Amino acid sequence: MTVEMELVGVRVQMPTSTPILLLREVTGRRRVVPIYIGGPEAHAIDLALSGTPTARPMTHDLMREVIEGLGAALERVVITELREGTFYAELFLRDGAGGVQTLSARPSDAVALAARTGSPIFAEEALIDEAGIEESESAEDEGDEEEMVEELRKFLDEVNPEDFLP
């Protein structure tokens, strides 16, 4: 079963300056899934979130234009699994004839493309069970984003990529 996620943003883990993509469940337990990504991908996602125009199309802008130019649309993105410390994702493209094509993608590329097309992001529930982090009760009850961010920062300061290995 898949669960709809919202793109919280990209944060930087200190002291390594490693970018981390943060996705949160839209409903339910509102767990957060942190995904380590590369610097260029983090920049691409930040540009999409901020709506910052660029002089020339970025790679994910080009991907969007190619998809639309072929008469297709990005229906949704699904973060599918975590295997040996690596996250996997799939793009679901609806073609002009109404068929759906599924393409394997890195989560960072899938999310960057979804951010540019306004397409929904989902994650497999088993993946959220495995890699998700619970929000604190008080942050959820009070709607205190700052408390949630601080809790997440503490987690990110202590976590290592190896923690996600089986």
Regions of interest found by a model, annotated:
Residues 1-166:
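Divalent-cation
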